[in-house]
């Protein structure tokens, strides 16, 4: 049953929506296998991801069955101490100003060599750190690992022509199929290098 059909039924809400398996599949496919917030791998199996309500159900009940309000998120260290939680688990009922499905989030972000993700925009940076907690050690280490691999490649290809760098970017962002976890780190770094080549 589609969300639209279910929404038109009497006493419908997200809890009694029965096609969550199909919904998980659609979200994972649309997001190409990555968490909407941290870029970790998600899969459509129950217990391997969460269906995130960008506008939380508690404050925006009218949007709980709106597909444009739904995202696929990782489990975000659910059940662990608050300071280790991230993504939807950490966000809970807090509001986010930017929806990653409707906004070019990547244009607001940069990465440090230690894997830290940050933004020059004050409120965006606050939400990255305080609401989503995207700089927990686990996530920083994963981003650093991707960046280290790119830096190692760059050592041997720093004089490569633009076409070769573009092909490397395309490996991280192919036109179809699943994306590499934390790929945006590599795409960001390589794109910056590419922009400097004349």
Positions of PLM-derived features:
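Polybasic, low-complexity binding patches
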Residues: 60-68, 79-115
């Amino acid at each position: 049953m589609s969300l639209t059909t279910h929404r038109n039924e009497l006493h419908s809400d997200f809890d009694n929506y029965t096609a969550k398996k199909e919904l998980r599949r659609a979200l994972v496919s649309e997001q190409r296998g990555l968490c909407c917030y941290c870029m970790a791998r998600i899969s459509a199996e129950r217990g391997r991801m969460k269906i995130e309500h960008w506008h939380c159900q508690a404050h925006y009940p009218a949007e709980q069955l709106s597909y444009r309000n739904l995202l696929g998120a990782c489990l975000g260290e659910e059940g662990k101490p608050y300071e280790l939680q991230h993504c939807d688990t950490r966000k809970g009922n807090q509001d986010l100003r930017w929806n990653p499905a409707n906004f070019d989030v990547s244009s607001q972000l940069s990465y440090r060599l230690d894997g830290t993700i940050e933004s020059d925009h004050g409120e965006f940076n606050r939400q990255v750190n305080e609401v989503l907690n995207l700089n927990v050690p686990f996530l920083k280490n994963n981003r650093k690992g991707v960046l280290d691999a790119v830096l190692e490649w760059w050592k041997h290809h720093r004089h490569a022509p633009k076409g070769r760098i573009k092909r490397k970017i395309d490996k991280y962002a192919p036109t179809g199929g699943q994306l590499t976890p934390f790929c945006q780190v590599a795409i960001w770094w390589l794109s910056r290098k590419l922009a400097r080549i004349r």
